[in-house]
């Protein structure tokens, strides 16, 4: 999501054309401008850019939207070295936008708020040693957490219990 070539959404130009065509319709009542630039954004610049695009749409169309849906929420910090979004600055950015706009804001809570609510608990069954690399075999599978295999997502691994028990070497 978030790019012109993606399957969802419209370009700003196309949206303005449709808004002009339908804003005086007796059958269609446009009440919401909905945008979605992505769901794993961890810095403020894309949000600033998004709000500037929304401002331009409102200025160009002179249309009063009852709601503005800002789409996906803030990204989650999957790795210790990844960027973490500053909630205070994000809040100030939205408040600044609202000072000049009377629309009600809608947005998803985002992974940064809800993503840590779940965890996968697994145990090591055995370790497979090969000439090129070693594999830790768990009692969990891709159906439990497909994201790393599907698109290389990273998740922290935290041992719940550390013991020095030997794990059998099966091949």
Predicted regions and their residues:
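Short glycine/threonine-rich loop-to-helix capping motif typified by GTGT followed
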Residues: 43-49, 78-89, 115-126
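Short glycine/proline-enriched coil/turn segments at helix->beta-strand junctions
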Residues: 62-64, 99-103
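C-terminal extensions
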Residues: 69-79, 84, 97
């Amino acid at each position: 999501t978030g790019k012109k070539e993606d399957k969802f959404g419209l370009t700003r130009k196309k949206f303005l054309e449709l808004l002009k065509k339908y804003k005086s319709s007796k059958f269609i009542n446009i009440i919401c401008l909905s945008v979605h630039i992505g769901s794993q954004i961890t810095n403020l610049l894309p949000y600033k850019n998004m709000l500037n695009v929304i401002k331009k749409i409102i200025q160009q169309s002179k249309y009063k939207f009852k709601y503005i849906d800002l789409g996906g929420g803030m990204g989650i910090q999957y790795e210790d070295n990844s960027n973490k979004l500053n909630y205070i600055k994000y809040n100030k950015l939205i408040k600044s936008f609202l000072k000049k706009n009377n629309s009600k804001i809608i947005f998803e809570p985002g992974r940064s708020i809800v993503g840590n609510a779940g965890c996968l608990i697994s145990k090591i069954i055995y370790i497979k040693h090969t000439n090129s690399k070693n594999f830790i075999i768990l009692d969990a599978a891709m159906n439990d957490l497909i994201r790393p295999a599907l698109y290389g997502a990273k998740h922290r691994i935290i041992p719940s219990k550390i013991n020095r028990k030997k794990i059998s070497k099966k091949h």
